[in-house]
C-alpha cells in the first residue's frame, strides 16, 4: 500500500487601498462596468459579475517585465530546503495507514483532516512534516496574508475582492501549499488574529493583524499533541476548518477572512483523549503503533542514520520516488471530479453506518469522499468495494460510541460490519 500511495505582521486597513509589490509575477484584473449591478452574485456582501459563481469569476492574467523566473523560484525553494532538510515521505518505512490518510486529504481537502493517535516515538510528526515536499503549487495574490485565490471569491480576503471589483490590477504568483505548525502554548489571539482597538477608535479604521488561521488558508494546519490543547482552541480550529471562515470580534468590531485548510492533529492516547464531539469533527482517524518486526526496526534505524549523516545525499536518493508520488497526487487531484461511486455502494456505506449506530451523517459523507480519493489515487474513475474496505475503518472508528465492556478494537468492529453488509 505504501507504493500506491508567513503570517504577515502588517496591519490591514479596510478603509485604505491595498498596495501590492508589482515585482512578483503576474497581474490579475476583473473588468467591470461602472454603475452596472445587474447579474451580480454576492459573496460575503460584495457583488461579483457572474452567471454561475466561480465558473464566471475568471480573471485576465498578464505577465509583467519583472516576473520571477522558474529558476529563481526553484532556487528559493532549494535554499529553504537546505536550511531545514525534511525527511522524504517515500522513505518512511511502514505506517501505511497513516500515510494513506494524509495522501487522501491532500487529494481531497473536503474530507476534513485527519487525527493521528499513537505511541510516542513512532514517527507521527516526522511523517506529517515530510508531506511538505509532496504538496502541489497554487496561485495566490502576491503580498496577501490570506493566500487569496485569484479565481475563487470564496477563498479571497475582503480587501482583494474589493480591489478586483474596482478593476485594480493585482500581482499573482505561484507558490507551494503552506504547512503551518500550531504551537501547543499558542494563545487565541495568535491563532485567530487581533484587532487594534486603539487604532479603530482614534483613526476609525479596522486594523487587523492576521493569525495562524490566515496563514493556513488554502494550506495545512498541523497541531502536535492536539489532545493537550485547550478545548476552546480546539473548538475554534474545528469550527474554522468546517466553515472555511474565521471571524474575530472585539469591542463591537467584527472582521472575517477565509480559513480553508486541512487540519491534521496528532497525539499520544496515554496523555488523554479528545472529547467525542471534537473527534467526530475530524474526517479520518489513523492509529499508529510501534513496529514490532526486528528487521523493519533495523531498517528504520539505518535509514535515519543515513539521513542524519548526510541529509542532501539521502534526499537525492529518493528524488525519483518523490517526484513520481507528487505526479500521482497531482493527477489524482485533477481527475477526482470525474470519479463515480455506484448508488448501490452508497446505500451499503450508509447501512454500515446505521447498523454501527454512528451519530450524524459525517461518517457517510467522509467515507464516500475518501473512497473516491483512493480510486483517483489508483488512477481509476470508479469506486470499488475494495476502496471502501480500505478507508471505512479510518472514517468510522472514532465515531463509534465507546463501550467500556467491549474489548475489541473499534476498527475491527467496522471491518466486521463492512463484510457482513457487503457480502
What are these regions (language model features)?
Residues 256-260, 264, 271-356:
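Phosphate-sensing "switch" segment of ASCE/P-loop ATPases
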Residues 134, 138, 304-308, 395-398:
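Phosphate/oxyanion-binding loops and surfaces in catalytic or ligand/nucleic-acid-binding neighborhoods
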Residues 1-51:
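N-terminal chloroplast transit peptides
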Residues 2-6, 13-21, 54-68, 86-87, ...:
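Peripheral, non-AAA+ core regions of ATP-driven protein-machinery
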Residues 92-96, 121, 181, 318-322, ...:
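Conserved phosphate/pyrophosphate-binding and hydrolysis machinery centered on Walker-type P-loop NTPases
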Residues 2-3, 348-362, 373-423:
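C-terminal engagement/docking regions of AAA+ P-loop ATPases
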Residues 100, 125, 235, 276, ...:
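Non-catalytic, well-ordered alpha-helical scaffold segments
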Residues 3, 44, 58-65, 69, ...:
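Conserved ASCE/P-loop NTPase catalytic core
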Amino acid at each position: 500500500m505504501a507504493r500506491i500511495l508567513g503570517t504577515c505582521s502588517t496591519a490591514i486597513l479596510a478603509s485604505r487601498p491595498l498596495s501590492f509589490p508589482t515585482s512578483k509575477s503576474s497581474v490579475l484584473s476583473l473588468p467591470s462596468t461602472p454603475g452596472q449591478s445587474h447579474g451580480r452574485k454576492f459573496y460575503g456582501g460584495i457583488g461579483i459579475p457572474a452567471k454561475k459563481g466561480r465558473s464566471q469569476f475568471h480573471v485576465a492574467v498578464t505577465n509583467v517585465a519583472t516576473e520571477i523566473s522558474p529558476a529563481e523560484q526553484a532556487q528559493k525553494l532549494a535554499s529553504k530546503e537546505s536550511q531545514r532538510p525534511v525527511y522524504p515521505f517515500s522513505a518512511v518505512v511502514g505506517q501505511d495507514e497513516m500515510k494513506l490518510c494524509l495522501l487522501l486529504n491532500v487529494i481531497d481537502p473536503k474530507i476534513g483532516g485527519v487525527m493521528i493517535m499513537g505511541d510516542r516515538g513512532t514517527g507521527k510528526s516526522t511523517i506529517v512534516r515530510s508531506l511538505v515536499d509532496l504538496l502541489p503549487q497554487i496561485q495566490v495574490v502576491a503580498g496577501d496574508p490570506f493566500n487569496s485565490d485569484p479565481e475563487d471569491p470564496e477563498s479571497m480576503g475582503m480587501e482583494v475582492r474589493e480591489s478586483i471589483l474596482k478593476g485594480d490590477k493585482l500581482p499573482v504568483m505561484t507558490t507551494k501549499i503552506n504547512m503551518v505548525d500550531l504551537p501547543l502554548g499558542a494563545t487565541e489571539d495568535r491563532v485567530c488574529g487581533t484587532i487594534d482597538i486603539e487604532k479603530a477608535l482614534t483613526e476609525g479604521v479596522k486594523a487587523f493583524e492576521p493569525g495562524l488561521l490566515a496563514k493556513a488558508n488554502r494550506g495545512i494546519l498541523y497541531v502536535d499533541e492536539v489532545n493537550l490543547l485547550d478545548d476552546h482552541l480546539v473548538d475554534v480550529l474545528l469550527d474554522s476548518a468546517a466553515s472555511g471562515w474565521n471571524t474575530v470580534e472585539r469591542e463591537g468590531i467584527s472582521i472575517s477572512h477565509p480559513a480553508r485548510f486541512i487540519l491534521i492533529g496528532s497525539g499520544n492516547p496515554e496523555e488523554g483523549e479528545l472529547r467525542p464531539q471534537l473527534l467526530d469533527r475530524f474526517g479520518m482517524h489513523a492509529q499508529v503503533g510501534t513496529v514490532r518486526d526486528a528487521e523493519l526496526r533495523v531498517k528504520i534505524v539505518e535509514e535515519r542514520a543515513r539521513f542524519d549523516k548526510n541529509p542532501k545525499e539521502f534526499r537525492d536518493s529518493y528524488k525519483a520516488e518523490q517526484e513520481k508520488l507528487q505526479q500521482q497526487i497531482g493527477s489524482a487531484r485533477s481527475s477526482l471530479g470525474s470519479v463515480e461511486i455506484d448508488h448501490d455502494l452508497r446505500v451499503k456505506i450508509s447501512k454500515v453506518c446505521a447498523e454501527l449506530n454512528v451519530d450524524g451523517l459525517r461518517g457517510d459523507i467522509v467515507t464516500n469522499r475518501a473512497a473516491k480519493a483512493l480510486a483517483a489515487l489508483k488512477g481509476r474513475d470508479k469506486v470499488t468495494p475494495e476502496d471502501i474496505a480500505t478507508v471505512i475503518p479510518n472514517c468510522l472508528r472514532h465515531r463509534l460510541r465507546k463501550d467500556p465492556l467491549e474489548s475489541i478494537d473499534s476498527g475491527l468492529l467496522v471491518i466486521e460490519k463492512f463484510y457482513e453488509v457487503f457480502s
